[in-house]
Amino acid sequence: MEWARLIAGLAHYSGDVGLAEELAQDAVVAALEQWPEDGVPRNPGAWLMTVAKRRAIDLFRRNRELERKYAQIGRDLDTAGAGGTSDFDQVVSDDIDDDLLRLIFTACHPVLAVPARVALTLRLLGGLTTAEIARAYLVPEPTIAQRIVRAKKTLAKAHVKFETPDSQQRPARMSSVLEVIYLIFNEGYSATAGEDWMRPALCHEALRLGRVLAQLAPAEPEVHGLQALMEIQASRIPARTGPAGEPVLLLDQDRARWDRLLINRGLAALSRAEELGGARGPYALQAAIAACHARAFRPEDTDWARITELYAILAKAMPSPVVELNRAVAVSMAFGPQAGLDLVDQLAAEPALRSYHLLSSVRGDLLMKLGRAAEARAEFERASELTRNGPERQLTAMRARCAEANVHIDISGWSPKRIPPEVIRELRGRLNGQFLWGSDYPFLAPERCLSELSDLGLPADALQTVLHDNAARILGLNR
C-alpha cells in the first residue's frame, strides 16, 4: 500500500493524479539508483516523498501558473528537513487516510468508463504494472497502457478535483467504487475467458482494497457488506479446483478445505454491516447468502429456504435477470427441480440472458434432475458453446456427454448381496434407473467398479445421473 500512499500524498498537493504517478515513478527510479550504494534510509516512504516533491519543484518552476503549488511544497520540504527522516504521515499529510480515500474516489470516478476505472485502480492503488494488468485480463499490454493514459487525460479534461464527494454525491460515488472493486474480485473468482478457471491474484488484490476501504470508511454499511462477501467467497478458493485444475462446483467441494479464518472475518464484517443498518444493501444481502453456505459443514445442511428468501429480497433491492436465475437455483434446491425450472423458463426471453451460458447450464442441470436427459444434453452443449472460459467449456461438455442415455455401470456376475451398501441406499432413495446386468463383460469386483467410477472425476450431480439412468433392475426397482 506504500505505492498508493505515495501517489495519494502527491496527488493531494499537485491536484493531478497523472502527474502524481510520474513523480512517484521518478522517486522509485532514484531509489533504485541510490539505495544500493547509500543503503536503504530509515524511513523509505519519507525519502521517496521528499525526492518526489523535489522533482515536483523542478517541474513547477517551469510553469508560473503553478507557482502557488511550488511554494506550498517548498514549505513542506523546509518542515520535513533535507534528510527526509521525518515521520511519513507528517510528510504526506496530517491525515494520509483522507488522501487514500480521495485517490480511490478519483480512480473510480463516473466520468471514466468502467474498464478504465478498473485499470486505473489496479495501477494506482494496487501498484500493478501495465503488463500485470494485461495478463490478468488477457488484453494486449499496449491496450492497457493506452486505457490508463486516456483515463488520466479524461480526468484532467473534466477538471475532476482530487477530493472526496460531498454528502449528496457520496452514495452514488461510493457505489461506483464498490462496483469496481467487486468487478476485479469477480474476474479473479470466475474468469470471463482464457484457460484459467480462476485468477486468485485478482481476488486477493480486490480483497485487500476492500479491507482498506473498510478502514477508511468505517461508517459505510455496504463497504463492510462487500468486504464480508469477498472474504466468504475467497474462503472457497482452495476447494474450487481439483488436482488437475479442473473446476469443482459448490456442492461438490471439500468443505474442509474452506478457509475458516476468512469465513470468520467475513461473518464479522457482515455483523458490522448489519449493526450499521445495512442488512438489506445488495452486497450485505449477497454476503448473507454466502454466509448460509459457509455455516453448512455439509451440502445437505444448507438452509435453502433461507437462501430463497434472501434472493427474493435481493431481487427487489437489485433487480436483475441474473439474480432471478440464482433465485431459481435456490428454489429448485428448496422446493424441487420442477419449481426451479418453471422460474428458469420464464427467464428464457430475457434479452440480457440470451447469450448467457449459465442460463443453459442451470436449465440443463434441472432437466437432468427431472430425468429429461436428451433436453439436458442440448442445454449443456449450448452452454459449452457460449462460454469463453476453457475449463468451464470442458466441464459443460463433459456434463453433456454424461447426459447420454447409453451410459451404464456394468455389474455382471454380481450377487445382490455384494452390491455396496452405499449404492443400495442411493437406489432405495431417489435413483430409480438400472445397472447393466447379464452382459457379456467379465466379472468386475464392486471395489474396482466403484474405484473406476470415482476416477472419472464426475461432478456429484453427473454421478447421480449415471446411477439414475442405470440402476439395477435386479433390485426390483422400476424407472
Where are the language model's segments positioned?
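A short, charge-rich alpha-helical start-of-domain segment used by transcription regulators
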Residues: 1-8, 18-21, 171-179
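Hydrophobic-face residues of short alpha-helical interaction/recognition segments
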Residues: 6, 10, 48, 52-60
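Short, charged helix-capping/linker segments at alpha-helix termini
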Residues: 7-24, 34-43, 141-142, 192-196
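Structural recognition of an alpha-helix C-terminal capping motif at a helix-to-coil junction
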Residues: 22-29, 42-54
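Amphipathic helix-loop-helix modules that constitute alpha-helical solenoid scaffolds
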Residues: 63, 71-115, 123-130, 139-312
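Catalytic pocket-lining loop regions of alpha/beta-barrel enzymes
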Residues: 378, 397-436
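Mid-to-C-terminal alpha-helical segments outside catalytic/metal-binding sites
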Residues: 398, 431-434, 444-479
